[in-house]
Amino acid sequence: MKDISKYQGIIPAFYACYDEKGEISPEGVEALTRYMIEKGVKGVYVGGSSGECIYHSVSERKLVLEHVMKAAEGKLTVIAHVACNNTADSCELAAHAESL
């Protein structure tokens, strides 16, 4: 049986962070990630529908995940939602998530 202990505890959906222009804020994403770590969150679910993924382009979804991973520094279990309304984009997001 595989160890599933990394999936215990609080694992909320991660909300995207925006700047004054309505663009994804890498700094905001990193700050929210660090805040969640400080508050005892054990993992995050990035890119799901609660995190506005249906409104984001593939490049925006990649950007959010990249900055979550950067700020998490291995301290969080990160679950990357990669589903899209077409297979090619889902495959692209899955390959990107795996590369991080």
Predicted regions and their residues:
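Active-site beta->alpha loop and helix N-cap motifs at the rims of alpha/beta catalytic domains
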Residues: K2-P12, C17-L100
